Amino acid sequence: MSNTTDSALWTAFIHVIQRDVQPAVGCTEPIALALASAIAASYLPAKAERIEARVSPNLMKNGMGVTVPGTGMVGLPIAAAVGALGGDPDGGLEVLKNLSSQQVVEAKAMLDRGDVRVDMQAGDEILFAEATLYHGDQWACVTIAGGHTQVVRIVINGNVLFELAPESPSEQVVCHAHDCLKQATARQVYQFATQVPFEQIAFILQAAKLNGALSQEGLTGNYGLHIGASLMRQRGRGLLVKDLLSDIMIRSAAASDARMGGALLPAMSNSGSGNQGIAATMPVVVVAEHVGASEEELARALILSHLMAIYIHNQLPTLSALCAATTAAMGAAAGMAWLLEPRYEPVALAIGSMIGDISGIICDGAANSCAMKVSTSVSAAYKAVLMALDSSGVTGNEGIVADDVDQSIANLCALACGAMRQTDSQIIEIMAHKCHCD
């Protein structure tokens, strides 16, 4: 490959990372609806009196069981209400960062009056959230689709104020980055992470800072299923040994506990998901601390982890029946393997072994239990790394794993894009029946 091609690809890689690795407060599916509400509210002459919202089945799935930051409540109605009454329309995934207790009280009162309604709407968009807010005879409707912060339409009192053109400049940039990832290989991701000038990737160290703080919050607070804190207590009872594997599990799970349990601290997300960002970050941070890695080595390992996770997720639907914490942890396996043995072969071998191990974990909606899947995924990642360091791994003779890691990834993603669509529909049907949403 020529230097010119390398330069163009590396520029695209940096753009993709900066686009897909972003701070986010709260689970990003309810946050997408909160953002739509906040933007719509900014066009009303006074506070919203009533909210009508529509979301795609997958967004409904990921918004039903997760705590909305600062509220102590789960579900999309409270997300829509606090977004309308206290959200920052310019905040993106941090729309609820400055939410006040008084605004939460007002939002809960709005729900109690029955002034918030969220319906499920099937359609072509997997990720879709639309909020229509009313004040007297004034109304504003904002539609987000295709991405957690991508506003595609704004309508004020029946007048279309904004509509995203299919070939707008922003869409062209996204498509270019998407095409670059489709044409790239895992080896090129590895080469970029290990060779790009440090100053161009130093920004990724913020992921360690944000997700590390979230992990500490999860260990000291009472969030979600408090899996990280529970595992830590079992150490004191002598039921769990203090070692690198348990550190990886505990610190990753604790960050997810806080994330899904409604902490107001931001997570550094990956591919629109805080849990994916956590799974791609915390195992790498723990191993980097263990080996005494330099700041540059940590940054390169984090870039390798996050970009590999993005590279894999780029072949998946935005939301699907495949638990994406598993694919993010494949990125973490790459980062950990490089820290322990800086060669491409262990990286590729570890990813293949993970595909042969945990590829069947389903996504049954964002919830506190996601922290369990995060802990499972990161422990599998470290196990795969240990095997790879011993030149051992799942081979191309077994299951969906191929001798080539890129083909193994393609095989896994083909399942999510094909047969698992029916699985996704069945999951949504079961969950809708549980809460009488159907």
Curated annotation (Swiss-Prot):
Pfam families, alphabetized: SDH_alpha (PF03313)
Family of the protein in this entry: Belongs to the UPF0597 family.
BP term (GO), one: L-cysteine catabolic process to pyruvate
UniProt-listed InterPro entries: Ser_deHydtase-like_asu, UPF0597
Species of the source: Yersinia enterocolitica serotype O:8 / biotype 1B (strain NCTC 13174 / 8081)
GO molecular function (one): L-cysteine desulfhydrase activity
Protein name per the record: UPF0597 protein YE0448
Coiled-coil segments on the chain, per record: none
Signal sequence coordinates: none
